[in-house]
């Protein structure tokens, strides 16, 4: 056991450095490089670009994303909130800096696995950015606002069997999907299960996951000791599916009892290791559990892997289906089918007719929840050098320009000579367009593969220091990653050079004559915006500009978070940047290609004007979780003063921002713990409460600190 743990000590990554926008753009001009010096940053008060330079110092830019607050960190990565400057939508950006080829392969494997998984109960990867100059790989992940299931259980003590059954069914449904796509997670634990704002579960952090090959066994020591089965702790060869089932049993035990079957003595060593290796544990005497849930836990936590319950046995268990009409995977498949049917009914008859003409009938079922599919395909400009020759799924261009393509997106090209927009499917003929604002008048030919998925150009990065790979947990990753095992995925490909598919004579005319007209009008500044702005404002048929009709939604400028959002770091909903055409400082998207270039400074100015600085935000109203120790009849001002006195007496450093306290303390092992205390109103009652949120640090030490604070407050 000790020898296995010591094998992690040979990998130590450097601290991840943050690069400002001015630094990332230094290769473009000498002006931007000179602005990075300390002397240039200290400009005089009368300097006209002072507001922009101040904004650059506050927020860092990575590709098309403004980096905000850190919401998680580990030994090899850190997770930040990132705001897309084009859409205003927020994501969780996982930043890693590999030093060795092995570490880079592990990140490649994680990206490759996330590319093939498309499920509501699995965290989604939207994009991946590789920064060649600083050696960073950034994963743009879905932002889950509810936090970890561990914190959810700590706030409630334990879950009822009904609520635990709901989460367990969702976890089981996501795991069935992973195993059906030959992926084992190998690091299932409460910290890697996230709860969204709707109370649904999502599996995250696939850093230890691997591809299952029939007949091959795995031998890597990975995962957390409390959740790892005996075969991993004894360094035996094992089957990845059986490892996940053991971890599911430990998670279910923790949900319904509020504690783990085994405890850690110093955060690493398991107390009672001999009992763990034999699969022996006891249920707490003060918790009353049904015989069905005990039987299910006893079937999953079995020392012998071959005697452990299978997924088919678990999904048909009496306790799992109690109160439900269908099994978990059947219920999910029905929900997805109903959702797709509802979306098809909402489409206009003309759009349905167009889809039937351009797509074969077999493609209507391409969103099957059990079949993997590629999410994105890359079109690389100028270079096809892969990040690592052993992986076909991650391609890093030598120059920093890229075109990222999203599946199932049609390009609408509006021609001034024809009022009716021509809907062209990219999977039929190559579409050629010119973007002088992004690629300096370089022509790009984008053609899609002969796959059943229609693909279109989506984004062209204006940043010369970043290159993007096809999208394929926003949580901290600890320890050494297991050696990657690559598997060729036929569903994930690259865009070929030529495509000879054709439809009919009328459609061929669109691709031949319309293409020349398109280039002709583009150089006369008469053509309309293409898929870049069509994808951003898809509800508009004519995407010539952004009008003031779009709903004004404010996005923060202080590192991706303003004072209003700061009260709720993880409860952030997707929003759009309001670019008002009537505002003199806001950028406008025009049909002219020369006006399509807009800078970060314009976006930041528009955000700053709309952010409403200095206004005291309203206190949030929440349903819970609350108990008698975290609720009070005191008004918010009195409660804030009471919390400040308590934090000062306990020597916990903090910084208050309206109703939120950013706290920092040290655990007994001298590890820093960052967490939040938010004052909020209890929904439907005339009383107020406090809510704790862990940002980084040891989970158990954080739980002990919260208990001490609640006890000392004496609300």
From Swiss-Prot:
Keywords: ATP-binding, Kinase, Nucleotide-binding, Serine/threonine-protein kinase, Transferase. Residues 335-344 have a biased composition (Basic and acidic residues). It catalyses: L-seryl-[protein] + ATP = O-phospho-L-seryl-[protein] + ADP + H(+); L-threonyl-[protein] + ATP = O-phospho-L-threonyl-[protein] + ADP + H(+). Residues 666-715 form the KA1 domain. Its EC number is 2.7.11.1. Residues 381-399 have a biased composition (Polar residues). The active site is at 187 (proton acceptor). It comes from the Eukaryota. Residues 24-65, 335-399, 446-530 are annotated as: Disordered. Residues 24-37, 345-368, 451-478, 487-513 have a biased composition (Low complexity). InterPro entries: KA1/Ssp2_C, KA1_dom, Kinase-like_dom_sf, Prot_kinase_dom, Protein_kinase_ATP_BS, Ser/Thr_kinase_AS. SMART domains: S_TKc. One of its GO terms (biological process) is protein phosphorylation. It is an enzyme of class 2 (transferase). ATP binds at residues 71-79, 94. Residues 517-527 have a biased composition (Basic residues). Residues 65-320 form the Protein kinase domain. GO terms for molecular function: ATP binding; protein serine kinase activity; protein serine/threonine kinase activity. Belongs to the protein kinase superfamily. CAMK Ser/Thr protein kinase family. SNF1 subfamily. This is Probable serine/threonine-protein kinase MARK-B. It comes from Dictyostelium discoideum (Social amoeba).
